[in-house]
Every structure is written in C-alpha cells, then in structure tokens.
Amino acid sequence: MLSFTPSRKLETELRVLQGIVVEIYKNIEQLSPEEAKYLHNFAFVSNIGASTRIENAVLTDQEVDWVDTILQKDGKTTAFEENKKFILDKLEKDRERSVEEVVGCRQMLSTVYLQAKELFPLTEVIIRGLHHDLLRYYPEAANFAGGYKKTPNRVIFINHETGEQRVVLEPSPPGIITSTAMADLVNWYNSNIRENPWPLLVATEFVFRFLAVHPFQDGNGRLGRAHFILTLLQSDDKY
C-alpha cells in the first residue's frame, strides 16, 4: 500500500485528470499511423531533451531529433560508436558529454517504451540494466555504470551567483543499506502497481523513494524520470 492515504480533494483531482487523459486518448486513437508516429517521436525527443538539459546537457530538441534520426537510420547497437565522429563534427567537440548523455538517455527510454510490459515484474537487475544503458556511451562511467554506488553521494543546490551551497538530500549510504532499500522498493512496487486504483500515486511514491536512496553514483535523476514513465506503462490502466 501507499505510505499515505489520498485525501478526498486529491482523489477528486485525480478523477478530473483521468477524465482529461481519457479524452486525449480518444483523440489520439483517431490519428492516422503517420500522425501517431510523428506525435510519438515528438514526445520521445522532447523527453530526452528535457531530461538531459535538467542535468546541464546543452543540446536543443532540434539537435536531439537530428541525433535520433541519424541513429534510427543505422538501427544497430553500435550505431553511436560508428557515427560518433560525424555527430560530434556537426555539433562541435565541446558538446561531447552532452551528446553522450543524450544518446544514453535515448537508449534507456527506447527500452522503456518498447519493452515496458516485458520488464514486469521489476527487478534490481532490470534497474541496473537501464542504468547501464543510460551511461554506456560515457567513458568515465565505465567503472560504475549498472552498479550501485560505492561512495557516499548527496544532492547539493548551488547558487552560482553567490557561490552558496546547500545540501538538499542526504541519501542512503552505500553498501548493505542501499542494497536492502532497493530490494524493499522493488518488492513494494511489484505488489502495488497493478493493485492500487491510482497508478499515478504509485509511480510518484516509487520515484520519490528511489531518489531518496539515490542508489547510483551518477544518473539517478534521469533514471528516476524514466522509471516514472515505466511505472505508468506497466500499470493495468490503458490510459
């Protein structure tokens, strides 16, 4: 069950939101295959762009769309490695980290969108696999991609104008506490996502608890946002 009981006001707002979503879903069903494909690609690219820019990547949605188009033409798992020089030459070398983040996020979200149902029940192996996909093109992450953190991490707010720093979140320490917390989280999720009448609330609590653990050395924010989508796709609510 959820760690909280939804208020009547919240349940009313959820019903209103669900009604809006149902109407949107009905409209989407009327689209032609070409229009539906365009809309899906637009949402996919926007998701990648927004999620990586939060982490200070600098590629615009237009540039993300261009990279996605280049990689779609190839379609192989080695597409980025084979096209990396061409992509960086077009987007300037100083954007290399941003490109690597975008391509990794694209890989992870592709898995989420295309295999959501097959990824249920959720396991720690699946979560670590998505993390590996996210960071697979970032060479500096080679030693920790797909593995839980081995050193403490924290979320810090930095005011770049004043230099002031403030700790926003003190996550679980590495080791047995993190691994136990992740095992508990996965078990809780699998027991609730298809039983609770409000999948949106389960998705929200899952991501909150995931970020409270902050199980990986890097990429927790992007992975958490991907998990939000995954949980909704894995629910029994077709809308």
What name fits each language-model region?
Residues 1-239:
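FIC/Doc superfamily catalytic core
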